[in-house]
Amino acid sequence: MGSKNNRQPATTAITAGRDDSGSLAPSLTPATTWSSSGLEESHRQAKAIHETKFYSRYANPTVEAFEHAIAELENTQAALAFASGMGAISSVVLALCSKGDHIVAQRNCYAGTLAFLNGPCARLGIEVTFVDGRNAQEFGSAVRPGKTMLVMAESPSNPHLDLVDLSALGAIKGPITVVDSTLATPLGQRPHDYGVSIVLHSATKGLAGHNDATIGVIAGDQELIGEIWGYSILHGATASPFDAMNALRGVRTLDARL
């Protein structure tokens, strides 16, 4: 679903996610279903992780091109797109947390994230401790060994623009660390380079950038992204190929816009 690269992010933004057709513009594949060679092949596809040409809730070539581009930009092994930024946030939390688990989260965060952590998470028995993200030590101090599954931060935060010490966050051992890097974009920072487990974007905003795509995306190591993908096909917050095409077009202009 992606590969690490050593190119400058601005160059990657222009070239990442291109297919083999030679087209400079993102290609659109609106298909929802693909044929197979037989029943055995269908069974194999249904069990495969992120099978591109099976069923669009599992994967889609246009969406996959966008995912490849984000993985390259974030310098991670893989990426996974969702129907929105909140689709990404809720899928990460619900894929990795169960009743009785604990989350440490930044207090000054996006209103939708705050509502999700205070609402559905509480109803599902997932406890959340909120900390001041401007003091990175508070994240580590709030971790409960063996119980805290996620440490969640935004940098810069929306809308207060609070910054988080990414090195300190990446150094936390035990829980999976998540940084919403929407307002920075990969051209401003790459949290995974500091040891953060998952980088998250509401790509509707800076990445897509043209007000014509609603889409979210996460990036991280292959195994972790694959685990979240397994939940995402049940959660159903699948990215549209039309939005992925527009978002990938937006990524091409990212450096010029910033």
Q: Residue ranges of each PLM-predicted region?
A:
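N-terminal glycine-rich, Lys/His-bearing helix-loop that initiates the first secondary-structure elements
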Residues: 1-50
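Conserved PLP-enzyme active-site core in the AAT-like
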Residues: 2-4, 10-19, 78-258
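Conserved N-terminal alpha-helix of the aminotransferase class I/II PLP-enzyme fold
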Residues: 36-87, 112-119
